[in-house]
Swiss-Prot record:
<dbReference type="GO" id="GO:0019556">
    <property type="term" value="P:L-histidine catabolic process to glutamate and formamide"/>
</dbReference>
<dbReference type="Pfam" id="PF00491">
    <property type="entry name" value="Arginase"/>
</dbReference>
<feature type="binding site">
    <location>
        <position position="247"/>
    </location>
    <ligand>
        <name>Mn(2+) 2</name>
    </ligand>
</feature>
<feature type="binding site">
    <location>
        <position position="245"/>
    </location>
    <ligand>
        <name>Mn(2+) 1</name>
    </ligand>
</feature>
<feature type="binding site">
    <location>
        <position position="153"/>
    </location>
    <ligand>
        <name>Mn(2+) 1</name>
    </ligand>
</feature>
<feature type="binding site">
    <location>
        <position position="127"/>
    </location>
    <ligand>
        <name>Mn(2+) 1</name>
    </ligand>
</feature>
<feature type="binding site">
    <location>
        <position position="157"/>
    </location>
    <ligand>
        <name>Mn(2+) 1</name>
    </ligand>
</feature>
<feature type="binding site">
    <location>
        <position position="153"/>
    </location>
    <ligand>
        <name>Mn(2+) 2</name>
    </ligand>
</feature>
<dbReference type="InterPro" id="IPR005923">
    <property type="entry name" value="HutG"/>
</dbReference>
<dbReference type="GO" id="GO:0030145">
    <property type="term" value="F:manganese ion binding"/>
</dbReference>
<keyword id="KW-0378">Hydrolase</keyword>
<dbReference type="GO" id="GO:0019557">
    <property type="term" value="P:L-histidine catabolic process to glutamate and formate"/>
</dbReference>
<protein>
    <recommendedName>
        <fullName>Formimidoylglutamase</fullName>
        <ecNumber>3.5.3.8</ecNumber>
    </recommendedName>
</protein>
<dbReference type="GO" id="GO:0050415">
    <property type="term" value="F:formimidoylglutamase activity"/>
</dbReference>
<keyword id="KW-0464">Manganese</keyword>
<comment type="similarity">
    <text>Belongs to the arginase family.</text>
</comment>
<dbReference type="GO" id="GO:0033389">
    <property type="term" value="P:putrescine biosynthetic process from arginine, via agmatine"/>
</dbReference>
Amino acid sequence: MDKFSLSHMSVWQGRQDPEDGELALRWYDKVQAWPLSGTAEPGVALVGFACDEGVRRNKGRVGAAGAPLAIRKLLANSAWHLTRPVYDSGDLTCDDGDLDAAHARLAERVASLLDEGHFPLVLGGGHEVAFGSWNGLNRHLVGQGRVGIINFDAHFDLRRKVEQASSGTPFFQIAEQCTAQGTPFHYACLGVAETANTQALFARADALGVWYVKDEAMSERSLPALLSGLDSFIAQSDHIYLTIDLDVLPGAVMPGVSAPAARGVELAIIEPLIAHIQASGKLRLADLAEYNPNLDQDNRSARVAARLVHQLTK
């Protein structure tokens, strides 16, 4: 398990309610450490990507490297309602600043988990996590079917990789790789903030055939149209990779990110969209990105991240 650490398992602790027996279990009671030998019953495998090197390169506010541990701490005391096992397979770090190597290790880990029948849920880290996550799925599938990428995000993250990869380049990197291997780049970005993306980025999204919806068009009234759009996108996909940049949420709900949203998309809109994606039966991989515990207020952002993890593991 190259550069993965299991030392964080001590954070899985919380309240005990013995008077209610098995019905009072919480996440910390059920999460299992990844077995160092042998095989595990297929389930959800948490993978920490404790890296914000891409955020630093993108001139953002660093701190997201601490997110996997902080999310676990809030998740540990959450009530347990799942029916399949959940494993914690540890954290991958990028202390040496070698993001390419970190991406390669994450891709290897994700591919291995998928090969063993697990659902990998990656806890970032900056949104540079997406390139490693996608590469793991790509390696696992080896050209078997079309992958649709659904990104809830205020930003396209389609910046060109001029010198180095960053948290702003992952989907352009994926597009380049798709071109190189002769596979379609099928990308949806939901929650785009016009003020956070230049005209050049909108033009690039159009040129790449990206389906995007601006934050102002994501409301309760527009939910039926959004679900219909998702249906069309998913119908053109054999497999779905879901990535959630937490800065898509309103800044009042999600202050703990490098770039809080002035408007954002409400959780009440995002949750049914996630459920709709899950109901398709095509979701193979998911990750959360950009939570920065250094910028959080009273753990508000961590609680939202933990809630999303809970939903993604149902």
